[in-house]
Curated annotation (Swiss-Prot):
Entry-linked InterPro entries: Ribosome-inact_prot_sf, Ribosome_inactivat_1/2, Ribosome_inactivat_prot, Ribosome_inactivat_prot_CS, Ribosome_inactivat_prot_sub1, Ribosome_inactivat_prot_sub2, Ricin_B-like_lectins, Ricin_B_lectin
SMART domains per the UniProt record, alphabetical: RICIN
An individual GO BP term: defense response
Repeat (1-alpha) residue spans along the chain: 348-388
PTM entry text: The precursor is processed in two chains, A and B, that are linked by a disulfide bond. Glycosylated.
Tissues/organs with expression: Expressed in rhizome and more abundantly in leaves (at protein level).
Lineage: Eukaryota, Viridiplantae, Streptophyta, Embryophyta, Tracheophyta
Protein name (database record): Ribosome-inactivating protein PMRIPt
Name of the gene this protein is made from: RIPt
Annotated 1-gamma repeat ranges: 433-466
Length: 603
């Protein structure tokens, strides 16, 4: 007979119930036992610290479990379930078994709606945070002696209890092993400070790595280094700010307007703790490689004859599907729509500029070095217009070669020519004519035209106030880095990453080109636009073979050919990168790893 329908409590003072020596866990408020008949079968995954080479597969499996309900129709970045909507208990948590080098195992219970650690167990004792919920209490680690910790699971509380900030805590295989097999396994005989510090290690190496491919890569490298027992790293400013700002970046992505333009700004820091303002999705993705988003808001359903005013959902993210109703979340969580003002940069990093800072009707729009002047400020309105100084950007007609100017929005000679659509790949298109903004040449004072879309670099644009090229190395198949000779008409290939090697550094321009950092007149180029054509380095010319788009699925796409960069035959020894049809295979996966000061990843 069940003694209690829910949970059987035997509440005693921790110091008495466990016979704990003075100075260890003396501030635990209570100990209780749970009814084992309430045990739920949750999805479970395993990771053995001795098998560090499987770390990438472990993180991939974790992402797959927590995104099983994500819509499969649209973009590539899944949004986690909304905790405000009903989620079957059996699908609410995932159990992660972490086994140390001595065979001891710690089990984490992660909430699938946010990847937070809800509770954990070790050595047949379950530990809950101070702010545990009834859902957690009634369904996790039933039948175990259970201890309630005096702190919560957020970073502020954990760092306060640990007495040390994350920036001063080493991460890597040895810290993870010690966290699991010493501090967490021996939780009843160590201080709460030790438990909190251990959790800071575990959370970053599991939950944060699942949220961000950037963090996953840093951790993975620590596992696969030749001397991994000694190899550790500490979080830098970029990593810490990514962890802190995950909710705000999730909100900005979900409410971003077409082209992934943010309504607000995500305030990050670079690795040296200098401010880094991010106002568009492409920049955010290149810095963080965000892989999962917290649910913040949904997009309104488009009614007959209309389209969503926030189409970024279809271009970037996969919204969760209500596991009970089989529909996407909307209702009261609908995203608010804004009208951000940003700069628009393009060919050779030059900005769109209203000539002579004049707001007279008919003044052409030209390329000009980027600055803070008002005639380079463009506001993206919900009616589809893009305006500067109160005037609409419009073409002089619907014919290829017509120039682009500003004009009074209500009296423009070709009314529908004032409407524009910004694509996530950087094209700005007039939907009536299908023509796109184009810079005929890379020179200041060049007047912009509308022409047929060829997906050339002359037609690539980036909307955002950070107009400087992003310098990065590019990690590909087998976690090796893209490298070139930095000379014209030479091939690129993969080598072991050595971040102090200039041949592995690339500058990402707003026109969609990937340039040699040491000579920015040289561009990564496809030697043709057919499958199996080689990827080489050529002098930049703004052509169709030099525009490359980093997709959220990890591929690098040539939008004209609709082919992606591919390590030929998955064989790095061939030293060939080619264009090929998308297959989803690992030899077509790439990631940017950006650092402004270019230290080693393990520093």
């Amino acid at each position: 007979m069940r003694v209690v329908a829910g949970i059987l409590y035997i509440v005693v003072m921790a110091i008495c119930g466990l016979g704990i020596q003075g100075g260890t866990l003396q501030d635990y408020p209570s100990v209780y036992f749970q009814d084992s008949t309430l045990q739920q079968d949750f999805p479970t995954i395993f990771f053995n610290i001795l098998a560090g080479e499987t770390y990438g597969d472990f993180i991939a499996d974790l992402r797959e479990i927590v995104t099983r309900t994500a819509d499969t129709k649209n973009g590539s970045i899944p949004v986690l379930l909304n905790p405000a909507h009903p989620v079957p208990v059996r699908e609410r948590f995932v159990k992660v078994h972490l086994t140390g080098r001595n065979g001891k195992t710690v089990i984490l219970a992660l909430d699938v709606t946010n990847l937070y650690v809800a509770a954990f167990s070790a050595n047949n004792v379950a530990y809950f945070f101070r702010d545990f919920s009834a859902l957690e209490r009634e369904n996790l680690f039933s039948g175990m002696l259970t201890i309630r910790l005096s702190f919560t699971s957020n970073y502020v509380s954990l760092e306060h209890k640990a007495g040390v900030g994350r920036e001063n805590i080493s991460l890597g295989p040895t810290p993870l092993d010690e966290a699991c097999t010493k501090s967490l396994w021996s939780g009843t005989t160590v201080t709460e400070a030790s438990i909190a510090k251990a959790l800071l290690v575990v959370i970053q190496m599991v939950s944060e790595a699942a949220r961000f491919r950037h963090i996953e890569e840093r951790v993975r490298r620590s596992f696969t280094a030749a001397d991994h027992d000694q190899l550790t790293f500490r979080p830098d400013g970029l990593m810490l700010s990514m962890e802190n700002e995950w909710p705000s970046m999730s909100l900005e992505v979900q409410r971003s307007i077409e082209g992934g333009i943010f309504i607000g700004v995500v305030q990050l820091q670079d690795e040296s703790f200098q401010p880094l303002r991010v106002d568009n999705f492409n920049t955010l993705s290149r810095y963080t490689m965000v892989a999962l988003l917290l649910f913040r808001c949904g997009h309104p359903r488009a009614t007959a004859g209309t389209s969503s005013t926030t189409p970024a959902a279809a271009q970037i993210i996969r919204m969760p599907v209500d596991v009970l109703a089989g529909e996407e979340y909307y209702d009261e969580e609908t995203c608010t729509v804004g009208e951000p003002t940003r700069r628009i940069s393009g060919l050779d990093g030059l900005c769109m500029d209203v000539r002579n800072e004049s707001n007279n009707d008919g003044i052409p729009i030209q390329l000009w070095p980027c600055g803070a002047q008002r005639n380079q400020q463009w506001t993206f309105h919900t009616d589809g217009t893009i305006q500067s100084m109160g005037k609409c950007m419009t073409s002089n007609g619907y014919h290829p070669g017509d120039y682009v100017m500003i004009f009074n929005c209500s009296t423009a000679p070709v009314p529908d020519a004032t409407k524009w659509v910004v694509s996530i790949d950087g094209s700005i298109t007039n939907p009536h004519s299908g023509l796109v903004l184009t810079a005929p040449q890379a020179a200041q004072t060049t007047i912009l035209l509308v022409v047929r879309n060829t997906h050339s670099a002359k037609q690539g644009r980036s909307v955002g106030d950070d107009v400087e090229p992003i310098v990065t190395y590019i990690v590909g198949f087998k976690y090796m880095c893209l490298q070139g000779n930095n000379e014209n008409n030479t091939r690129v290939w993969l080598e072991d990453c050595a971040v102090d090697r200039p041949q592995q550094w690339w500058a990402l321009y707003s026109d969609g080109t990937i340039r040699v950092d040491s000579d920015r007149s040289l561009c990564v180029t496809s030697d043709g636009h057919s499958s199996r054509d080689a990827i080489i380095i050529l002098t930049c010319d703004g052509g169709i073979n030099q525009r490359l788009v980093f997709n959220t699925d990890g591929t690098i796409l040539n939008p004209n050919a609709q082919l992606v960069m591919d390590v030929r035959q998955s064989n790095v020894a061939l030293r060939q990168i080619i264009l090929y049809q998308p297959t989803g295979n690992p030899n077509q996966q790439w990631m940017t790893m950006i650092t402004r000061t270019r230290p080693s990843l393990t520093s």
